[in-house]
Amino acid sequence: MARELRALLLWGRRLRPLLRAPALAAVPGGKPILCPRRTTAQLGPRRNPAWSLQAGRLFSTQTAEDKEEPLHSIISSTESVQGSTSKHEFQAETKKLLDIVARSLYSEKEVFIRELISNASDALEKLRHKLVSDGQALPEMEIHLQTNAEKGTITIQDTGIGMTQEELVSNLGTIARSGSKAFLDALQNQAEASSKIIGQFGVGFYSAFMVADRVEVYSRSAAPGSLGYQWLSDGSGVFEIAEASGVRTGTKIIIHLKSDCKEFSSEARVRDVVTKYSNFVSFPLYLNGRRMNTLQAIWMMDPKDVREWQHEEFYRYVAQAHDKPRYTLHYKTDAPLNIRSIFYVPDMKPSMFDVSRELGSSVALYSRKVLIQTKATDILPKWLRFIRGVVDSEDIPLNLSRELLQESALIRKLRDVLQQRLIKFFIDQSKKDAEKYAKFFEDYGLFMREGIVTATEQEVKEDIAKLLRYESSALPSGQLTSLSEYASRMRAGTRNIYYLCAPNRHLAEHSPYYEAMKKKDTEVLFCFEQFDELTLLHLREFDKKKLISVETDIVVDHYKEEKFEDRSPAAECLSEKETEELMAWMRNVLGSRVTNVKVTLRLDTHPAMVTVLEMGAARHFLRMQQLAKTQEERAQLLQPTLEINPRHALIKKLNQLRASEPGLAQLLVDQIYENAMIAAGLVDDPRAMVGRLNELLVKALERH
């Protein structure tokens, strides 16, 4: 038994690295694919188990299997200078401009690695395009990095198109004049080649001088019969060029690091930078002989070719999460802008901290598969910050450092296009699976409310409002409806969408304000969330229909003394004279707490209600500003009107008590007023009336 247990433990140790996520499999075709915690090869029943266990490879952690893989590197010290050296001055406005580019343009020193990898990718793309156009076979097209901590150097070498002596002078000797830019200019009508060229500014190479005491470049053009050359500079405004032997076709850059930048001669540090910025470069990328970019840029693939498990693993990668995406949108378009994107909605419900904290977008921005920003705050509006994913666009206007977006009409257009596409996607999902969408709205609805409140354009507010869901008086409890569906049910000639804010459906249906609306046989939306009222106040209208609170409708529709025209039997209602005398007495008792006391015949089960012009706005103002703490201050701000129901037993009894027991009658008036204020949501803390309630109970018990 002990022997079997030891064998089982040993087997578990061998399995553990393979069960980590995410994994990467080398499929028989040789092309690496992003795969789940165990590869499809490992999970497939027809695969050989021994082969399957060797297929998995992690991209987030170096494993023992990685170390056992044979190293592959083309970097070696074979170059030597031949003959004399010629000195040249930089052609772009002196050393001062070079200092600005090399020392002030970039916010982080580490981006020099990204820039040099991008340049190498461009060189390989140029060679690929040339050979394909000429019908020639493609050689090994690779990018290699090598670190040397002892010498304090980092080297990058590509097998791309290389440069002649003249190109070395023109491309590396002039700020903001790169071969990539010239190549694009020459291929304006060939979109495929143009779209794959990363560097367009010609300043990326000079980022090396942020960290370098000296930069050595060896390059040989892919043109037949080309010689190799060395380019050398310390960034002082002068560079040297000499013929060199032993130079391989392509370009090799050796950076001799400054004393305070030796960190970039560490393999671990460089690996982190490559993983951060250049994980999706199109060509094989090696660091000290080990393959780095084994992930696929699945956002560049055709959506129908990406499988669900690939989305799950890519979501975990970009979101740094362990759950699955609740929704996935793979969006590609070439008009009105070139966009390649994938968006995910996390399955995990956001916490209040996630909702309230001031965070920008969690969408990464790429330009031709090179990371520009890990959190691109300008690509999506702030209310969509719960979205995870990637946006890749060739049309994005970047500044010279390729780190900052240049706010422009194009960026605003991109933001609008993505926002509209996501809204359309959510609307489609709500129709496809209403129950799933209802859960999504329950978890993420606060973000949508924020979008409506913060949007400046009414059109945008109404677009976001299409995502809102509420219960309705016309539907069973728990069933949600949209504003569009409400509008479709409106009777001809109806202009308003009515809503009532309450903590729950029971309170909404027993509200005096809803009671007053039921007689109109009008559908009312029930809004239960704290910020619904503020949201609808900001929205104001939807589809040319005004959004009206039932409380406001009562005030506006009857903003004058209601005529006493009641056909109830005399025994069931106070007379007009009794009502007038009672209202006058109540005005005197309540004093400055009310602006007026008047009669209402819209109530049946409630004795009274308070009406305030724009009650929703007033309620929100009181809640946010925490003003009007006393009754007098509150009344001065709100100017409430108390409307009484002359048919209610409490009002009829009050009329009798005001003559026979004025003390008890005054307590009842105060309580009726407080009850109406509570029903209106205008009392923050009802504990102040506990003493009066106790006194009323004592007086009630004195009669028994």
Swiss-Prot record:
Tell me the function of this protein: Chaperone that expresses an ATPase activity. Involved in maintaining mitochondrial function and polarization, downstream of PINK1 and mitochondrial complex I. Is a negative regulator of mitochondrial respiration able to modulate the balance between oxidative phosphorylation and aerobic glycolysis. The impact of TRAP1 on mitochondrial respiration is probably mediated by modulation of mitochondrial SRC and inhibition of SDHA.
Per its UniProt record, what SUPFAM superfamilies does this chain match?
ATPase domain of HSP90 chaperone/DNA topoisomerase II/histidine kinase, HSP90 C-terminal domain, Ribosomal protein S5 domain 2-like
The GO terms this record gives for MF are: ATP binding; ATP hydrolysis activity; ATP-dependent protein folding chaperone; protein kinase binding; RNA binding; tumor necrosis factor receptor binding; unfolded protein binding
Q: GO cellular-component terms in the record? A: membrane; mitochondrial inner membrane; mitochondrial intermembrane space; mitochondrial matrix; mitochondrion; nucleoplasm
Localisation: Mitochondrion; Mitochondrion inner membrane; Mitochondrion matrix
A single GO BP: negative regulation of cellular respiration
Under which name does UniProt file this protein? Heat shock protein 75 kDa, mitochondrial
| Chain sites annotated for binding ATP | N119, D158, N171, F205, R402
Transit peptide feature range: 1-59
Organism the protein comes from: Homo sapiens (Human)
- Fetch the Pfam families from UniProt: HATPase_c_3, HSP90
Q: According to its UniProt record, in which tissues is this protein expressed?
A: Found in skeletal muscle, liver, heart, brain, kidney, pancreas, lung, placenta and bladder. Expression is highly reduced in bladder cancer and renal cell carcinoma specimens compared to healthy tissues, but it is increased in other type of tumors.
Q: Which UniProt keywords apply?
A: Acetylation, ATP-binding, Chaperone, Membrane, Mitochondrion, Mitochondrion inner membrane, Nucleotide-binding, Phosphoprotein, Transit peptide
Q: Write down the superkingdom of origin.
A: Eukaryota
Residue numbers of N6-acetyllysine PTMs: K262, K324, K332, K424, K431, K466
On this chain, the residues bearing Phosphothreonine are T174, T494
Assembly and partners are described as: Binds to the intracellular domain of tumor necrosis factor type 1 receptor. Binds to RB1. Interacts with SRC. Interacts with SDHA.
| In-chain residues carrying the UniProt-annotated modification Phosphoserine | S170, S194, S568
What family is this protein classified in? Belongs to the heat shock protein 90 family.
